[in-house]
Amino acid sequence: GSIVSAACLAHDLGNPPFGHSGEKAISTYFSEGQGMALKKELSPMEWDDLTHFEGNANAFRILTHQFEGRRKGGFVMTYSTLASIVKYPFSSQLAGKKSKFGFFLSEEADYQKIAGELGIIRLSKPDEPLRYARHPLVYLVEAADDICYQMMDIEDAHKLKLLTHDETKGLYMQFFDEKRRKRIEEVCRIVTDVNEQIAYLRSSVRGALIKECTRVFTENEDKILNGEFEGPLIIHICSPLKEAYDNCSAIAFQRIYRSSDVLDIELAGFRVISTLIDLMINAVRSPEKSY
């Protein structure tokens, strides 16, 4: 439990400002922007790391890298904790269209050492780009991420008035059978504050999803340990809960992530991050100048 808790806290440490749009801004800077001029100075694998920038890989770097003036070993976390944050245990050469991978070229040897010590199954052949099976606890960290962020995004949308109270309540109620819904309605008659009602519903949904993901994990333990289990735990939950979860995901995409306020922030993020990268590159290239 402590390993998973620590990994949950650490796994997003490498995300840039503006979240996933920040990752895209960094990638685009190098693939389409002024960073293209640096391509000739980098190896193909280093270039892949930059043009498919990934926050999870950056988290692994931050946690393990010996930065200037610091002790060796980064944050000096246990191997199990470090392995538990690597959701995509392969190099950027295998990133694909989703640009997901687990470690930069600069930390590839570190992950190989961790995998060797923990006995993590290597899936790639010696002449292929590096790819491993996941550490079993990755599935629990990923499930916690999938559950918490999806449900909290719905609650946040309610607070920001992107979703009405009835819409939000309806999305959460989908997760329960008729008997449980009646009990929830009884609580809501006592707790009249609408934000408290939604917080109670969100917490109840989270509990149901945790219980169901736990079932999926324990029932597929052998496949997980052998590196044969495919996909996150959340896609294998029972049909009623899966349908309700997918409905929340669809609404979040349509009404939250694509809202004008969010898109305005993303556009601003592109400009901010591009400017910051320019300044940092210039500082490295011309250290004699004052900025």
Functional labels for PLM-detected ranges:
Residues 64, 149-152, 156, 215, ...:
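Charged/polar positions within long, soluble alpha-helices
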Residues 139, 143-146, 209-212, 216, ...:
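Charged, amphipathic alpha-helical oligomerization/scaffolding segments
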Residues 1-6, 13-201, 210:
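Sequence-structural signature of the catalytic-core scaffold of metal-dependent phosphohydrolases
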Residues 219-291:
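Substrate-recognition/cap regions that form aromatic- and gly/pro-loop-enriched pockets
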Residues 184-239, 245-246:
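Long, amphipathic alpha-helical stalk/connector segments used for oligomerization, subunit docking
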Residues 62, 84, 88, 113, ...:
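Residues that form generic nucleotide/phosphate-binding pockets
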Residues 132-139, 194-205, 233-236, 257-268:
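Non-transmembrane, amphipathic alpha-helical segments
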